[in-house]
């Protein structure tokens, strides 16, 4: 088996084991079985994408990323596996060339036309102009591990209910309900300000 095949197997197994752990914590043995089955359905195509796309470079950094994604950052990896699976079911294409050695899976189309979205190690809709920004989100997930998605979610809630960003001098103008989120909340949550 090739090194990328091993990486794909490791990532897929990590997602399944995370499903067992999360399911077991929430629902005992039955929950663990459900977690294995549900996340297993996403782990298989995700692991294949990691292997086929040769996502991890064969150097020390690539190995370190693979280890982090299978351990400390496994909640983000599992969320990314689900995200990848849903995108593939809706016809999105895996760009294998751009994935190779990048440390992230590159999907061609985004969720929303003019935006890229990254969950875990899966980037949807990125391009050469904004890819550095999206890779910062992948880095943030690896750095903060199990705290990352919770921190991002909580910051979105706080920024929506308590719009602290209205105090910023260089903020975008709010022109309506949609603009409140697109021009107010979204660009002013911590992970976007950093990226």
What are these regions (language model features)?
Residues 135-154:
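Catalytic Zn2+-binding segment of zinc metalloproteases
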Residues 1-52:
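Transmembrane alpha-helices
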Residues 2-16, 20, 60-88, 92, ...:
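Metalloprotease/metallohydrolase-associated module, dominated by Zn2+-dependent proteases
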Residues 36, 44, 90-96:
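A generic short-segment signal for beta-strand/edge and adjacent turn/coil regions
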Residues 100-129, 141:
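Active-site scaffold of zinc-dependent metalloenzymes
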Residues 49-61:
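Transmembrane alpha-helical segments that serve as helix-helix packing and pore/cofactor-lining elements
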